[in-house]
Amino acid sequence: MELSWETKSAIILITVTFGLVYAWRVLNWMWLKPKKIEKLLREQGLQGNPYRLLLGDAKDYFVMQKKVQSKPMNLSDDIAPRVAPYIHHAVQTHGKKSFIWFGMKPWVILNEPEQIREVFNKMSEFPKVQYKFMKLITRGLVKLEGEKWSKHRRIINPAFHMEKLKIMTPTFLKSCNDLISNWEKMLSSNGSCEMDVWPSLQSLTSDVIARSSFGSSYEEGRKVFQLQIEQGELIMKNLMKSLIPLWRFLPTADHRKINENEKQIETTLKNIINKREKAIKAGEATENDLLGLLLESNHREIKEHGNVKNMGLSLEEVVGECRLFHVAGQETTSDLLVWTMVLLSRYPDWQERARKEVLEIFGNEKPDFDGLNKLKIMAMILYEVLRLYPPVTGVARKVENDIKLGDLTLYAGMEVYMPIVLIHHDCELWGDDAKIFNPERFSGGISKATNGRFSYFPFGAGPRICIGQNFSLLEAKMAMALILKNFSFELSQTYAHAPSVVLSVQPQHGAHVILRKIKT
């Protein structure tokens, strides 16, 4: 039956109407809304580039990133232009009250310490930005919000209490002794050698976190963490493409490899956890590793809530937290150790002061928990390394609802960015020597060094401060104590200074040093 003219007209009208409504929504999403937000930002004195369709400043961001990574920098600790080039460029060009466009959303760059303190402390008003590509690297606590975050944090916290870390100190010692033995085997007949210490330090921290996390299942844990490192490299390689809508669904070789790794990681971790759960049900003693402590705390939480299983963590949630152990415990500490060795190579007087302190406290004895906590000069050095070379260069947060932040009015859906490396290097906050290695500034502790201002947060801050910071600092003290007892070191002529961001701030071309065995 042929449709009447009126019916055809109605169908055409409906189709055109739907098409116009859809076109309007797309136009509003892609252009009108970003331009409206830009106008509101400029009215408040914020400066930045005009919005550009779809990608905003993202293309320039990645082009600049690629350019700075094409060659090493001078031997200087003014690393912000290299590790955060576009953010640094934006602030230099537009001033401290500025913004950039990351895709269709503006990042308002916060440089005022009190504004940053407020963002960190008000986690419900400023939740974490959830990037889809990051879920393949970080899971668990770091991705959660609200009551779910509170539950996970409550269950995980006991595993990172200082008394539990004290129990793990022998594990740290074993892995660090293995490192020293391996380095000794590489020495020439005159007791010295040139080597890139970066791979060894990565291997050390991976070994420590695998032993500390999984105990008897340590070898399986190491394989999982190696796959996670590969995931991080693949994701950073495809970071710009991930901004293209639906890109992540294309069956590229990298995407297939990412999916394959993902299945292997999940399967291996589930097997480790299920094996441990069976041992607990059989009445075997809980292992004093992070997984054992996590499962013990989880069972206690369930029991306290009348044995209601969903009051604790599910298998998938425990897997997520195990994956987070690696990111929190391996990346941060290996970065801290490598930059500590680079800086102590460049400042031999501080290297000697640190060595003298280690020998005074431990002599020929093995480093232990109590002694490590007495290393004041070592703590000053590590704090200063974390100031100059923070593990992450900045942190983004989403604006949940329209809110006043100091003299700024922020609107729901916008994002704020806290440039850690710029704050840590700010001469107005740290003095004229802000870009120079000077551990003495921390001789009176962090509060005195910052003059009470919120200008130092290498592990984040507020309720969401990194749960593994004490673990990382304790491991770093153990490793450096043993390295300083056994070796002196200086930079090799082949060392190329190239701090670079691959999830965290790492040496792009390694860390080539000359090791010399200390005769005892």
Swiss-Prot record:
Membrane topology recorded in Swiss-Prot or TrEMBL: Single-pass membrane protein
Transmembrane parts of this sequence: 11-31
GO biological process annotation, one example: saponin biosynthetic process
EC number in record: 1.14.14.-
GO cellular component: membrane
Primary residence: membrane
Keywords: Heme, Iron, Membrane, Metal-binding, Monooxygenase, Oxidoreductase, Transmembrane, Transmembrane helix
UniProt KW Oxidoreductase keyword: yes
Protein name: Cytochrome P450 72A68
Function (record text): Involved in the hemolytic saponin biosynthetic pathway.
Annotated family: Belongs to the cytochrome P450 family.
Gene Ontology molecular function terms on file: heme binding; iron ion binding; monooxygenase activity; oxidoreductase activity, acting on paired donors, with incorporation or reduction of molecular oxygen, NAD(P)H as one donor, and incorporation of one atom of oxygen
Enzyme class: oxidoreductase
Presence of keyword Iron: yes
Domain of life: Eukaryota
Binding site for heme: C466
Coiled-coil ranges (or none): none
Cofactor requirement: heme
Compartment(s) where it occurs, according to its Swiss-Prot or TrEMBL record: Membrane
Disulfide bridge partners, by residue number: none
Signal peptide segment: none
Pfam families: p450 (PF00067)
Catalytic activity as recorded in UniProt: oleanolate + 3 reduced [NADPH--hemoprotein reductase] + 3 O2 = gypsogenate + 3 oxidized [NADPH--hemoprotein reductase] + 4 H2O + 4 H(+)
